[in-house]
Amino acid sequence: MSSVVVVGTQWGDEGKGKITDFLSENAEVIARYQGGDNAGHTIKFDGVTYKLHLIPSGIFYKEKISVIGNGVVVNPKSLVKELAYLKENNVATDNLRISDRAHVILPYHIKLDQLQEDAKGENKIGTTIKGIGPAYMDKAARVGIRIADLLDKEIFAERLQINLEEKNRQFVKMFDSEAIEFDDIFEEYYEYGQQIKQYVTDTSVILNDALDAGKRVLFEGAQGVMLDIDQGTYPFVTSSNPVAGGVTIGSGVGPSKINKVVGVCKAYTSRVGDGPFPTELFDETGETIRRVGKEYGTTTGRPRRVGWFDSVVMRHSKRVSGITNLSLNSIDVLSGLETVKICTAYELDGELIYHYPASLKELSRCKPVYEELPGWSEDITGCKTLADLPANARNYVHRISELVGVRISTFSVGPDRNQTNVLESVWAQI
């Protein structure tokens, strides 16, 4: 029995897709356990770049099973489009499995998402308007429609009718907006359900059977720990649990079956949307990092906010997600900077603190305390080992590992697969 969880340790966009794809080579099952099509991951496979939002990275390996777990909220329309996109590119999808317990995103979720965000005005959260939050709200309120319900025409019609009555009251009376008609949704989305029916099953059985048979299972998180609804910068968070603990809820695999947790981070920090970001850069250095790192959202296309590496954030992520191994990406983006900085602590009202505050008021008063290190000018995109790195780059990597308190198992010096370098095999440690 071998299992590895891949989690983002910052605010998403850390390069999880590439690392998941890299680790997938030695896995037999790859599963997603939370989030929806608000998450975007970019994968290069056989020289082609693919952008996926719902389907796990393992789909490119015909002999491996890819799982969308029960903790994922699925927009059937988006999923059907993504399947068609893969088929157009001659990528087989018959190795996909979708949980019958996963909840469904419907048009009224997306409309409610937009209306609620607009109503917040300056206090908006920066949602991707994909209906993720409202779908999870319905799930918690026990009025959600699951994949199993979508496939049953009678049950789907009954629950859709009940939900539309409630949602339309909100649209008309609270937001002064138009109602959504039953016929605008029912036949179209029932048909989407029929198109994905061949993939639907009890994925908890598949995952547990695989682990019990001694197979290697890789769990792929979306977003990042700092967007976790419990452990992140609430309320500027997603509506699910990207932390490693979310695996047990979102996949139906017990915690005793989790072996390793790989935390993925960039050599700097980025964030899409609103919310606290203590090390954010607003100067030329920030513009350089954004330009060189091509920091634009996979899902939204929005420019990402960028800043220095924050070890306070990383230690928080390590603690709440039980990170055992670190994967450090995008070191090459910092090449050419005369000085690189690492945030080692915050100064709050004249005192040093080393933990990430829950209070947004406290966070707004936190000033990052930096350790400055000399930068490097060399092109490192061809480096294969730590010894190949310039001394200053190597020292930077070592210092990050020291401050976070986790050994680095892989490091990346570019977007391509062959630019990801293994220092210690995670699978070999199990």
UniProtKB/Swiss-Prot annotation:
Q: What pathway does the annotation place this protein in?
A: Purine metabolism; AMP biosynthesis via de novo pathway; AMP from IMP: step 1/2
* Keywords (A to Z) from UniProt: Cytoplasm, GTP-binding, Ligase, Magnesium, Metal-binding, Nucleotide-binding, Purine biosynthesis
The Swiss-Prot or TrEMBL record annotates one GO molecular function as:
adenylosuccinate synthase activity
Q: What residues form the catalytic site here?
A: 13 (proton acceptor), 41 (proton donor)
Enzyme class per UniProt? ligase
Q: Where does substrate bind?
A: 298-304
Q: Is Transcription included in the keywords of this UniProt record? A: no
Q: What is its main location?
A: cytoplasm
Q: Which residues bind Mg(2+)?
A: 13, 40
SMART domains in alphabetical order? Adenylsucc_synt
Gene Ontology biological-process entries: 'de novo' AMP biosynthetic process; IMP metabolic process
- What InterPro entries does this protein's entry cite? Adenylosuccin_syn_GTP-bd, Adenylosuccin_syn_Lys_AS, Adenylosuccinate_synth_dom1, Adenylosuccinate_synth_dom2, Adenylosuccinate_synth_dom3, Adenylosuccinate_synthetase, P-loop_NTPase
**For this protein, what is the EC number?**
6.3.4.4
Q: Where in the cell is it found?
A: Cytoplasm
- What CDD domains does this protein map onto? AdSS (cd03108)
Q: Which cofactor does it need?
A: Mg(2+)
Subunit record text: Homodimer.
Return the protein name: Adenylosuccinate synthetase
What is the native source organism of this protein? Enterococcus faecalis (strain ATCC 700802 / V583)
